[in-house]
UniProtKB/Swiss-Prot annotation:
Tissue localization of expression: Expressed by the venom gland.
Protein species of origin: Lycosa singoriensis (Wolf spider)
Keywords for this protein: Disulfide bond, Knottin, Secreted, Signal, Toxin
InterPro entries: Spidertoxin
Prosequence residues removed at maturation: 23-34
GO molecular function, one term: ion channel inhibitor activity
Domain of life: Eukaryota
SUPFAM superfamilies: omega toxin-like
Cleavable signal peptide: 1-22
Disulfide bonds: 36-51, 43-56, 50-67, 58-65
Pfam (any one): Toxin_9
Entry protein name: U16-lycotoxin-Ls1b
Compartment(s) where it occurs, according to its Swiss-Prot or TrEMBL record: Secreted
Predominant localisation class: secreted
Amino acid sequence: MSPKVQALLLLVGLITFLEVHAEEELSETVESERSCAKEYQWCDWNTRPCCDNISCICSWIGTNCECKKGIICTIKDWYKGK
């Protein structure tokens, strides 16, 4: 086998390996993002709670739920520079 063919096969193998590894990392990231909602994202008490002890606030009829920090947490974050 010529060196060019060997180099090509090595390159194709490396690209395939990197692609599979990237897909695994992406699926882990997507799964962790689904587990909880960040501030100002939609939430549901049963299926998608808020991250970082943020409250899930809903409209008066129980729809349009959104993760929101209370005023005290907002002031603390502002004071800490977050």
